[in-house]
Amino acid sequence: LKARPTATMMPSAMPAPPEQPAVLDPLRVMRLGSASLERLAREPEKTGRVHSVFERAINVLWRDGHLLTLHGPGPLAAPFAVALERLPTRGSVAPGMSIESWNFDWRDAERVALEMPDGPLGFAADALPERAGAQALRSPAGARARQALARGIAAGDARALADAACALIGFGEGLTPAGDDCVLGALAAVHRLAPGWLAAHTGQRDRLAEAARTRTTDLARDFLLEALDGRFAEPVLAILTALSDDLVGDAARRVLAMGASSGADTLCGIRLGCRALEARVARR
């Protein structure tokens, strides 16, 4: 892709604001992934900082250089999400504010497995609804990259997959560019239906990881790095593990409600990956 809208880059560290709330109420954790729990407990002497604050989520740049996304009760919206009993009150948290392990109370938290289990689909790929997503993916350049991604997956060509995915990473605008969402969806299908395939091609996997680290936003970076390791948000897991056409339709509608177009773009990648892998099997 020769012309690409510039992804909105978030700084990897935020300066401390001139004033901070004196005390942050304890953050009672209800649910989190096992990997996130390990991250919370690691290196307790170091400090994290609030990265960005939204109405329904707070991103924390943790001391390992990657994000934790705090949100209220419900399904984990990211593989690095932490579902709290309630979010801090508006105005009590600001970008740059220090946050440490002792701010969290995870003693009674449910540990959630966010790794994609391998196995066949319990639904027809054509049962996944189609919804127009971001304009970037529907542009000629976006369509060419999506087609190249599908061809690489269908052919079992890890280099072609990586070429197409690298072209999509950072393509589009927003906190998670449309191209990144599409790649994430395709990786979810790969981990479900072709487990170990990408891991067996370490050079191509490393190319994707490097593109995630250098070509997109902080939030999209961490979604993609987690996806390369086989970890996904609960709504994405619910789609790939659905046991019937009706259930996958319900799960897909929940994903479609995510963000302005992120859900549709992720679903585009899931559908693309599932169809491509079905085509690969049919040719054997």
Predicted regions and their residues:
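Short, hydrophobic/amphipathic alpha-helical patches that form generic packing surfaces
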Residues: 170, 181-192, 241, 267-276
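Phosphate/adenylate-binding glycine loop and adjacent helical scaffold
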Residues: 11, 15-164, 168, 174-179, ...
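Acidic, carboxylate-rich catalytic segments that either coordinate divalent cations
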Residues: 235-284
